[in-house]
């Protein structure tokens, strides 16, 4: 009975170590994903004002050429 308890305790201990290692890897993977998402958001923030300013400069000229009311 004592050896059975010892074996179960050993399995439990090894299982908890394995779970904690998997959890650390998962947390590291999630951090990497978050970094990519943050970079995408930064790129979107940089791209949107640029696109708006280009559209503000280009659209009036295009509208003028299409309607020929300059």
Swiss-Prot record:
It is found in: Secreted. Disulfide bonds join 64-70. Residues 23-46 form a propeptide. GO terms for biological process: defense response to bacterium; defense response to fungus; innate immune response; killing of cells of another organism. It comes from the Eukaryota. Keywords: Amphibian defense peptide, Antibiotic, Antimicrobial, Cleavage on pair of basic residues, Cytolysis, Disulfide bond, Fungicide, Hemolysis, Immunity, Innate immunity, Secreted, Signal. Expressed by the skin glands. Residues 1-22 form the signal peptide. GO terms for cellular component: extracellular region. The keyword Cytoplasm does not apply. The keyword Lipid metabolism does not apply. Antimicrobial peptide with activity against Gram-positive and Gram-negative bacteria and against fungi. Has been tested against S.aureus (MIC=5.5 ug/mL), E.coli (MIC=6.5 ug/mL), B.dysenteriae (MIC=2.2 ug/mL), and C.albicans (MIC=7.5 ug/mL). Can regulate or mediate antimicrobial response by stimulating mast cell degranulation. Induces histamine release. Shows cytotoxicity toward solid tumor cell line HepG2. Also shows a potent hemolytic activity (LD(50)=5 ug/ml). Belongs to the frog skin active peptide (FSAP) family. Brevinin subfamily. This is Brevinin-ALb. It comes from Amolops loloensis.
